[in-house]
Amino acid sequence: MRKIIHVDMDCFFAAVEMRDNPALRDIPIAIGGSRERRGVISTANYPARKFGVRSAMPTGMALKLCPHLTLLPGRFDAYKEASNHIREIFSRYTSRIEPLSLDEAYLDVTDSVHCHGSATLIAQEIRQTIFNELQLTASAGVAPVKFLAKIASDMNKPNGQFVITPAEVPAFLQTLPLEKIPGVGKVSAAKLEAMGLRTCGDVQKCDLVILLKRFGKFGRILWERSQGIDERDVNSERLRKSVGVERTMAEDIHHWSECEAIIERLYPELERRLAKVKPDLLIARQGVKLKFDDFQQTTQEHVWPRLNKADLIATARKTWDERRGGRGVRLVGLHVTLLDPQMERQLVLGL
């Protein structure tokens, strides 16, 4: 049985700012773009969250909820430095590390000899070491599979951890709401509830054929997760090849103005996700995806070295006009393909 730890730093960007400037510790702060530039919140500290300020929220809305919010532009060099230090701490316990972003990672400690092989004690020690060396807090989840470790890391935030032992998995899944499973959004959750499926226990009683017919390949993933099955390895060589964001509408849209409005809402989230993965990364291409009411989908990409909203909107409009054919649109997505690190290195060396 595997021993997987998911470590998630607590409001990471904001925590670095509060550590480096103690005057910020007890006041609402957020990292994000300005209201004038239609920016979006990247991270908010817990005092700000008490006012309802959340990640991916438009800055203007955040300032309405919390007029005295202190808005910071972000210091990504400082965040990267802290992230690299945290990664080095992880490496003291295992070489099997899969970073998901600057502030979270999976660790496979199945074969680790530290702490007598106890994943629970390893997680506690890692969190304490991070605090001792960086004055930052982390939350952790421990479980025999990746998706449960990720869910567990959110159970006792901030600065806590939650353990799901192999023996506890069946009971934990029985009452686990389906929206806790990564990949189940509001639209999927609503469709599942319409089928009478609210928990993993409900899905366990459902015929796999029905799920496949209703949700395609995601139906199988949903069924497997509800059984506690997740065979994905912690991949130390994992390379993030793309970053994307998409929205499935509750009802199909038929007018370009509706599509453009969705892109306007998606774009700040794409910016936020890209910054979280690697703020200074060059991109190779950016593109759009439309999925139609007959479940056919089309993707259009352009070579573009930096994220550009105007180009994405123009690409989406061209795709809408040329490929929709009168069909309703049920999903709109934006994505960027990241530059191969070796190519990026060559470009840097060539300057």
UniProtKB/Swiss-Prot annotation:
Assembly: Monomer.
E.C. designation(s): 2.7.7.7
Start and end residues of each UmuC domain: 4-185
CDD domains on file: PolY_Pol_IV_kappa
Gene, per the UniProt record: dinB
Protein name (Swiss-Prot/TrEMBL): DNA polymerase IV
Predominant localisation class: cytoplasm
Keywords: Cytoplasm, DNA damage, DNA repair, DNA replication, DNA-binding, DNA-directed DNA polymerase, Magnesium, Metal-binding, Mutator protein, Nucleotidyltransferase, Transferase
SUPFAM superfamilies in UniProt: DNA/RNA polymerases (SSF56672), Lesion bypass DNA polymerase (Y-family), little finger domain (SSF100879)
Residues at the site labelled Substrate discrimination: 13
Cofactor note: Binds 2 magnesium ions per subunit.
GO biological process: DNA-templated DNA replication; error-prone translesion synthesis; SOS response
Annotated function: Poorly processive, error-prone DNA polymerase involved in untargeted mutagenesis. Copies undamaged DNA at stalled replication forks, which arise in vivo from mismatched or misaligned primer ends. These misaligned primers can be extended by PolIV. Exhibits no 3'-5' exonuclease (proofreading) activity. May be involved in translesional synthesis, in conjunction with the beta clamp from PolIII.
Top EC category: transferase
Compartments in which it is found: Cytoplasm
Gene Ontology annotations for the cellular component aspect, listed alphabetically: cytosol
Binding site for Mg(2+): 8, 103
Protein family membership: Belongs to the DNA polymerase type-Y family.
Pfam families: IMS (PF00817), IMS_C (PF11799), IMS_HHH_1 (PF21999)
Cofactor names: Mg(2+)
GO molecular function: damaged DNA binding; DNA-directed DNA polymerase activity; magnesium ion binding
Record's catalysed reaction(s): DNA(n) + a 2'-deoxyribonucleoside 5'-triphosphate = DNA(n+1) + diphosphate
NCBIfam families cross-referenced by the UniProt entry: PRK02406.1
Active site residues of this protein: 104
